[in-house]
């Protein structure tokens, strides 16, 4: 019986992780869950459904509200009111991540996942990582803290890489091929995207995801983050990772070996498969998701990425080459811009333009003594430097958005 802690349990990946566990209660026990606290009702339902002993909520004042929700839901279902240990505050998920477990699934959105990721690794627990941002911004701080095999990716693309890489030696790899659906605006030119709305950007063609990752997929920022994640996870040079557009989202990624062979992982788009692998790696769980239907004619297509229209991937590659605090600024500026875009304060194209402007400023070498503004390289990277760069990147992006982009 594996004990599992789920961070970000009320989000898309968190709820699907519980779904995977629900039909396998003889194999997995949920030892704790965490959430931001905006959906206390769902959190209470999860606690009751899975008899969860510990829950962490980022919102300081959530404890009483959660206890009331537990009483109401338990009463309506004729159940005894549970009395879990409730941790609250910004460090609650980090405290939970350090508790005894076999697997911690980090499904928190954004840079807030960094401290829980480091706490999980320090505890020696297997990390099923859906929070790519913590690896991207933490960089070598995360990879150096991890034992061999301790991080198991939950992103479908990186799970695909892990599976494909078992088909050859690491020294035999020529390149990684990272697939992208192309998002809702595939095939459109830059000028046609000037007036698209957040509602349009939320209409992903193949995946049902949370707000931030869906907007990131429309700008291709998500693919840029995945590029950085792949380089760090598998110690592959950024220039040996190619991004190709595959609209059907069936081939989740590929590995090309030095003899010319390419191994691909294919399955219908369903996050339950990489989640199940994240919980059970290197073993597979039977019937984790439906397989491909080979009884009907089908077509898989691949096309090059339009970097002129969607410049986020090359921006991410630039940040990755600079390393150190640059990826943290790339991610922070994006998160700030996504908030502004969803609030209607900036246009769609302003997202990547603002990221570029803020990243340029961070890497320019100007004598800016503002905490976090100046680039720190890998050789001097610390957690404080990453957090300062993250905070500066958010503030600076918000300032640029407020007064308009000047490049």
Curated annotation (Swiss-Prot):
This is 1-deoxy-D-xylulose 5-phosphate reductoisomerase. It comes from Cutibacterium acnes (strain DSM 16379 / KPA171202) (Propionibacterium acnes). 1-deoxy-D-xylulose 5-phosphate binds at residues 132, 156-157, 181, 204, 217, 222-223, 226. Its cofactor is Mg(2+); Mn(2+). Pathway: Isoprenoid biosynthesis; isopentenyl diphosphate biosynthesis via DXP pathway; isopentenyl diphosphate from 1-deoxy-D-xylulose 5-phosphate: step 1/6. Catalyzes the NADPH-dependent rearrangement and reduction of 1-deoxy-D-xylulose-5-phosphate (DXP) to 2-C-methyl-D-erythritol 4-phosphate (MEP). Belongs to the DXR family. It is an enzyme of class 1 (oxidoreductase).
């Amino acid at each position: 019986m594996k004990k599992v802690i789920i961070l970000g349990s009320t989000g898309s990946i968190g709820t699907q992780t519980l779904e995977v566990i629900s039909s396998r209660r003889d194999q997995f026990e949920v030892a704790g869950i965490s959430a931001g606290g905006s959906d206390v009702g769902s959190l209470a339902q999860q606690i009751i459904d899975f008899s969860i002993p510990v829950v962490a909520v980022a919102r300081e004042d959530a404890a009483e509200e959660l206890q009331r929700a537990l009483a109401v839901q338990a009463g309506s279902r004729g159940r005894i009111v549970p009395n879990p240990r409730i941790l609250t505050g910004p460090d609650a998920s980090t405290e939970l991540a350090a508790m005894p477990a076999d697997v911690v699934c980090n499904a928190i959105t954004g840079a807030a996942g960094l401290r829980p990721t480091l706490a999980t690794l320090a505890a020696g627990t297997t990390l099923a990582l859906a929070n790519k941002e913590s690896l991207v911004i933490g960089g070598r701080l995360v990879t150096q803290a991890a034992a061999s095999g301790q991080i198991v990716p939950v992103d479908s693309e990186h799970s695909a890489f892990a599976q494909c890489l078992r088909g050859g030696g690491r020294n035999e790899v020529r390149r990684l091929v990272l697939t992208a659906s192309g998002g809702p605006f595939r095939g459109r030119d830059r000028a046609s995207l000037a007036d698209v709305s957040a509602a349009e950007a939320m209409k992903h063609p193949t995946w049902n995801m949370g707000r931030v990752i869906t907007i990131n997929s429309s700008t291709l920022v998500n693919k840029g983050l995945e590029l950085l994640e792949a380089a760090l996870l598998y110690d592959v040079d950024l220039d040996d990772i190619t991004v190709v557009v595959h609209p059907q989202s069936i081939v989740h990624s590929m590995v090309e070996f030095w003899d010319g062979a390419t191994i691909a992982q294919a399955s219908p788009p369903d996050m339950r498969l990489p989640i199940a692998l994240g919980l059970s790696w290197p073993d597979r769980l039977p019937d984790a998701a439906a397989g491909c239907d080979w009884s009907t004619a089908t077509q898989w297509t691949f096309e090059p990425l339009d970097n002129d229209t969607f410049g986020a991937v090359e921006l991410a590659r630039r940040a990755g080459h600079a390393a150190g605090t640059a990826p943290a600024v790339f991610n922070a500026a994006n998160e700030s811009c996504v908030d502004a875009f969803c609030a209607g304060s900036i246009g769609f194209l302003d997202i990547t333009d603002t990221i570029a402007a803020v990243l340029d400023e961070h890497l320019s070498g100007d004598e800016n003594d503002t905490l976090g503004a100046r680039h720190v390289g890998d050789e001097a990277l610390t957690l404080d430097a990453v957090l300062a760069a993250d905070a500066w990147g958010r503030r600076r992006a918000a300032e640029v958005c407020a007064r308009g982009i000047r490049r």
